[in-house]
């Protein structure tokens, strides 16, 4: 786990292989509450296949099916899970401005197509997987510089459309911060989106947080991600997730 799990961020996750996260349900916070930093396992045995030929035949059949499928053979390999951004937006299912609507006017700017043509360095595959939908990215032409893995589809809508943000560099930077601190990007982005709606409805005041927090403000979104990772000040409210944040202002339905 990262610093977020150690200090009690409710949506802290368990990270393995540098950037791969067991992101949901706050399992990183559970480990942190037990003063458990990591679990390391090294196997000593092997796996014996009962019928090697049948196993190989089944594997080749699965390989062919995956390669011939337009989603697993083309879309995911070329654009990663971010291939879903434009698809979901066109179907009206892309959570936008804290899910007040399902269509985002800036979807193309945060799509898999745009990511592939701007910050993608190379694809990456999970062990044994032929789809190779992982994204290794680097930002060098923006003040939001950095490098790492992602963002995935869920991260793009949570830190992007849900916050009204079409700045792909800012979204990718916030994703890097979440990875480094060990925070679930879905809850992190959804919590910022909730805070933005509460701010625009006048429930959260600028005097309380020391800055404006409107939908579409990329700098404010990145700052909120940094605050929640610290679990201090207003960040301590953010670190409890969207439901508890909204409930603290008397509107848990937000």
Identify the residue ranges that each predicted region occupies.
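Intrinsically disordered, low-complexity segments enriched in small residues
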Residues: 1-254
């Amino acid at each position: 786990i990262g610093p977020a799990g150690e200090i009690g961020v409710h949506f802290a996750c368990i990270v393995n292989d540098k950037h791969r996260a067991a992101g949901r349900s706050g399992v990183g916070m559970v480990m942190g509450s037990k003063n458990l930093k990591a679990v390391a396992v090294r196997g000593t045995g092997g796996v014996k296949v009962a019928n090697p030929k049948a196993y190989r035949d089944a594997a080749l059949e699965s390989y062919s099916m995956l390669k011939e499928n337009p989603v697993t053979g083309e879309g995911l390999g070329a654009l990663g899970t971010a291939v879903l951004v434009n698809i979901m937006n066109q179907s009206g299912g892309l959570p936008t401005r804290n899910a007040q609507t399902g269509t985002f006017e800036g979807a193309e700017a945060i799509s898999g197509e745009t990511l592939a043509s701007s910050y993608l360095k190379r694809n990456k595959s999970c062990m044994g997987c032929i789809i190779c939908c992982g994204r290794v990215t680097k930002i060098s032409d923006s003040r939001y510089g950095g490098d790492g893995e992602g963002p995935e589809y869920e991260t793009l809508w949570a830190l992007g459309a849900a916050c009204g943000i079409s700045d792909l560099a800012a979204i990718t930077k916030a994703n890097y911060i979440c990875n480094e601190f060990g925070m679930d990007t879905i809850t992190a982005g959804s919590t910022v989106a909730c805070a933005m709606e509460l701010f625009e409805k006048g429930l959260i005041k600028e005097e309380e947080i020391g800055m404006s927090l409107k939908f579409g403000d990329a700098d404010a979104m990145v700052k909120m991600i940094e605050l929640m990772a610290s679990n201090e000040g207003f960040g301590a409210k953010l670190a409890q997730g969207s439901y508890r944040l909204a409930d603290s202002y008397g509107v848990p339905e937000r």
